[in-house]
Amino acid sequence: MLIGAEDGVEIDVSKPDERWWGEMGTVHKIIFGDCRDMREIPSNSIHLTVASPPYYNAPFDYPDLFKNYDEFLDLLRNVAGELHRVTADGRIACFVTDDMLVEGNKYPVVSDITRVMVENGFRYRDRVVWVKPRGYTRISRRSGVVLQHPYPMYFYPDNIQESILIFQKGRFDYHYLEKLPRKVREGSKINLKEYNDDSWYLSVWNITNVLPLEGRLEKGIAAFPEEIPRRLIKLFSFIGETVL
């Protein structure tokens, strides 16, 4: 978890912090804890959350995290409740996730996370589809069944996409921009050339994933490209604000 801090001391992150407006730098804090109980984070203090919640196949890595899909959803309900508490009014929480195939069964993770977040007070603002390169996966045993049995009813596609779910706590007060120093407001402007050239304005983003290369420090950790949080931070936060 990443929140505003200075030399290990927590700061008030309920509003843009004037101490960082001059240098436009970033301050980082890592908390090893449980997202179901984020007591370290003040209420209404987070301006943007970008997270990849535990995938439903996480028990392969964390066998005690949940025993079945109902327990998985219970975990997400607890996380959603805490996220609603720590999120400032009008601000955004983003989840990168997708439906999951486990032991031959497909689970509707995207729709269930959406329902859980709405039930915990968030508005469902939008969904962006993250498409990975076609070369990310070759024909697998799943999709390759058609090669062995080229008949109807044998089709199971390989997945090269995930969903970026965007939720909002209430409505954003756009008069907030008037309260920001001009330097902060102008420094937070979105690069329109990049916005147009890389098609940020579409509901489909083509972004190369991080390959799980042998010897990588992150081996075994979800391949999560930095480009996704970079875009979301640019689109949904201002300089001096707090990102979780």
Question: Which residues are covered by each model-predicted region?
Answer:
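Core catalytic lobe of class I
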Residues: 1-244
